[in-house]
Amino acid sequence: MTKPIIHETANQPQAFFWLLILILVQFLFYFKMQIDGYFYTKNQCDEPRRRAWSSFEVAIPPGYAVHGIDVSHYSCKIDWEEVKRMNSNGIQMHFAYMRATRGLNLVDYQFSESWQTAEEAHILRGAYHFYMFRDNPVDQARFFLSHVPIKSGDLPPVLDIENDLDVNDRKLNRDNILKDIAAWLYIVEKQTGMRPMIYTNLDYYKYYIEGNFPAYTIWIASYKSKGTVVLPDNRHWSFWQFSDKARCNGISERIDLNVFAGTIEQLYALRKK
């Protein structure tokens, strides 16, 4: 006798249900970690802290006339007048970049205040977006633009490409990632009338940027390089983040310190007209 064919589908809805539960738990855990870290930093920043230093406390690469910082909510509340006044062995801060947004759901809670008060202190300012590989690039661009009121005198917007937790899972989709990055850059340039810059570290530069986006200004992060930093394809860089351990008056936390490979006049020329 031929046995009847039995389709064992009874367990499929149950398996799908538990898969959804697993995905939801992972998402909630990730979201909780982000929120906990965010409010832990915010609570720390609410405490009074020392914001006066005798020097930058890091070795400054010689031969560069223009210096600046980049900050986020991890830098806590900033006294931009003190940042402007600091002078250590003739070195002053000429520009500051501030994280505005990350991915699709995080607006840096210090951004709005820093954006305004840095301008009042007559520090050249710029905003950057921390790119998340798993999020839609078009939506990320619109999210960034909706929170950054770029106007005449501001430095170009920056796309920060680094250390996304998901990047190792998506390396097989490198071509898609490059298309996504290009989409973000295109939308922001079209909306602001300014060509964005690309910030990245040497590892991400080698994997994603080398040989791509030749028309875009490069801001490279490298803490081990001495004197200067050389990109693997010898491409010119315009900004170099050489330390993440610097001190600066007006800021309680250690910060990122940068040099600009040009004159102050060339930096001014980058501003929005």
Where are these regions (language model features)?
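N-terminal Lys/Arg-rich, disordered targeting/topogenic segments
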Residues: 1-13
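Hydrophobic membrane-insertion alpha-helices, especially the h-region
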Residues: 14-34
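Sec-dependent signal peptide cleavage junction
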Residues: 34-40
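Functionally critical loop-and-helix segments that line ligand-binding/catalytic clefts
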Residues: 41-75, 81, 205, 213-273
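Substrate-binding cleft of extracellular glycoside hydrolase catalytic domains
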Residues: 47-183, 189-191
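Glycine-enriched alpha-helix->loop->beta-strand junction motifs that scaffold or abut catalytic
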Residues: 88-93, 123, 153, 212-219, ...
